[in-house]
């Protein structure tokens, strides 16, 4: 059976794994998921990630990060969904928690944070909020 929203599935797997304090979580891999994982790693929300290819199916492994026994990611919320896409221009990209969090945006120049998209001067699809 095919998945209707693979990105929402990725975010839910991360949330669920952190609630039960797992060290890592694995999921089917795709280019967009790897790009989101790279942004999460660059921003310090996860320790690391790796893509393991087993023939035709690749798997994305994400090493989760904790601080003082609590998950580093407190909020992980999907914004743009298959039924209602959310696009924002370069001047309309929202700040998450007044700049304490990050909005992950898919732009023509790749997947990046809200700060980088504003600095680059591009808008795009707001994928999710992370705090």
UniProtKB/Swiss-Prot annotation:
The domain of life is Bacteria
Question: What SUPFAM superfamilies does its record include?
Answer: Ribosomal protein S8
Which cellular components does GO assign to this protein? ribonucleoprotein complex; ribosome
Query: GO biological process annotations for this chain's record?
Result: translation
Q: What keywords appear on the UniProt entry?
A: Ribonucleoprotein, Ribosomal protein, RNA-binding, rRNA-binding
Q: Name one Pfam family in it.
A: Ribosomal_S8
Q: Which InterPro entries match?
A: Ribosomal_uS8, Ribosomal_uS8_CS, Ribosomal_uS8_sf
One MF term in GO for this entry? rRNA binding
In terms of NCBIfam families, this protein maps to: PRK00136.1 (NF001109)
The subunit structure is: Part of the 30S ribosomal subunit. Contacts proteins S5 and S12.
Q: Could you say which protein family the record assigns here?
A: Belongs to the universal ribosomal protein uS8 family.
Q: Which PANTHER family has this protein been placed in? A: 40S RIBOSOMAL PROTEIN S15A
Instruction: Say what the protein does.
Output: One of the primary rRNA binding proteins, it binds directly to 16S rRNA central domain where it helps coordinate assembly of the platform of the 30S subunit.
Designated name of the protein: Small ribosomal subunit protein uS8
Q: Which organism is it from?
A: Burkholderia mallei (strain ATCC 23344)
What gene makes this protein? rpsH
